[in-house]
Amino acid sequence: MEPPLWQRLVAPLMYLLPWSDAIPLGFGPDGLFLQYPVLRPLVLPALPLMQLERSIPFGLGGLLLFFVLFLAVVRNPNVPYFLRFNALQALLTDIALIVLSIGFRLSLQPIAAGSLLLGTLSSAVVVAVLAILLFSLVECLRGREPDLPGISQAVRMQLY
């Protein structure tokens, strides 16, 4: 059964969460958005979410948003499955992105700060998250579940 139009329009908004966390990686010293200013308009859809995350003190905005999405959407059986699936998939993508970002900061930043290696890896992560966002957007608008290898299987195991 194909999800109704409102679900197909709301589901892609979930993927703005990992996109908002990938954007700072693109503004590093050799960041993608600094090298290619034509890509900067891609930041605009995530700005309201980034402002919301930063409006809560002590950096707890992202954590609060995570818990709201997880408890109010993913774990709520009254929310349609299509929205729950996409919310959890976006949250797992965001967790993977945060772990990568922390790994970059702890392992590569001290030894390769400002180097080509760090800039290349950061740009690759931004491009990967952008590809996930665009793929998920198209699949959601078509009314299909975006099938991300590894992540989608974990989502299905959690939701069933």
Where are these regions (language model features)?
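Alpha-helical membrane insertion/targeting regions
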Residues: M1-Y160
